[in-house]
Swiss-Prot record:
Residues 61-81 have a biased composition (Acidic residues). This is Probable peptidyl-tRNA hydrolase 2. The lineage of its organism: Eukaryota, Amoebozoa, Evosea, Eumycetozoa, Dictyostelia. Keywords: Hydrolase. Its EC number is 3.1.1.29. One of its GO terms (cellular component) is cytosol. Gene3D superfamilies: Bit1 (3.40.1490.10). PANTHER family: PEPTIDYL-TRNA HYDROLASE 2, PEPTIDYL-TRNA HYDROLASE 2, MITOCHONDRIAL. InterPro entries: Pep_tRNA_hydro_II_dom_sf (IPR023476), PTH2 (IPR002833). NCBIfam families: arch_pth2, PRK04322.1. GO terms for molecular function: peptidyl-tRNA hydrolase activity. It catalyses: an N-acyl-L-alpha-aminoacyl-tRNA + H2O = an N-acyl-L-amino acid + a tRNA + H(+).
């Protein structure tokens, strides 16, 4: 009889011990979960804050780059702020154009000719930017008219350039570096203008279309 009572007592103690142990384990697990969740939330917040800082930094750097671009344009001297590409036709200047005179005796490929024409056109534009800003603006605002003509020799290109200089017309003669198809120093394309049409025609009117 006494043995049964002892067994019952041990069973009751074991039961309560199990209940208490389970309770404390649950409490500890809950606390651990809360702590873990709190840490995860803090980590997420920290990541979001870092991402926000990176985004703000990138935006600031982007703004700085834009400022640098504006400054570069100003240094290049494209136009004054007051010019600001106003679309207003200047009757005194009239219609403007640029002629590209291509030398035909060199046997240049189409790709080579295109590249040389680009060099000539941009070179003449840079000269006009310095010496004929109003004419350049008129030309750029109203179509950037370009015509390709042909010459048969270096001497013809040089004569045309000299005539343009005499008349005060912007011109630019391209001398090739000789890295590809033709000898170094070869005169390839002459740009005449941008300038008023009459001034350009005074130099190139006798030439044939390319």
């Amino acid at each position: 009889m006494q043995l049964n009572k002892d067994i019952l007592l041990v069973s009751i103690i074991s039961l309560f011990s199990g209940v208490l142990l389970g309770y404390f384990q649950a409490k500890c697990f809950k606390r651990s979960t809360i702590t873990k969740n709190k840490e995860e939330v803090e980590q997420i917040k920290e990541i979001e804050n870092n991402n926000q800082k990176e985004k703000e930094k990138e935006e600031k750097e982007g703004d700085d780059d834009d400022d640098d671009d504006d400054e570069s344009e100003s240094i290049d001297g494209d136009y004054d702020e007051n010019d600001d590409y106003e679309i207003e036709y200047d009757e005194e200047i009239g219609d403007c154009k640029q002629v590209l005179v291509i030398r035909t005796d060199l046997g240049m490929t189409k790709g080579k000719i295109i590249a040389q024409c680009c060099h000539a056109s941009l070179g003449a534009r840079q000269k006009a930017l310095k010496d004929s800003k109003k004419v350049l603006r008129q030309w750029e605002n109203f179509g950037c008219a370009k015509i390709t003509l042909k010459a048969n020799s270096k001497e013809e290109l040089v004569d045309l350039r000299n005539k343009a200089k005499e008349l005060g017309v912007v011109s630019y003669l391209v001398l090739d570096s000789g890295h590809t198809q033709i000898p170094s120093g070869s005169a390839t394309v002459l740009a005449v203008g941008p300038a008023p049409k009459e001034a350009v025609d005074a130099v190139t009117k006798h030439l044939k279309l390319y």
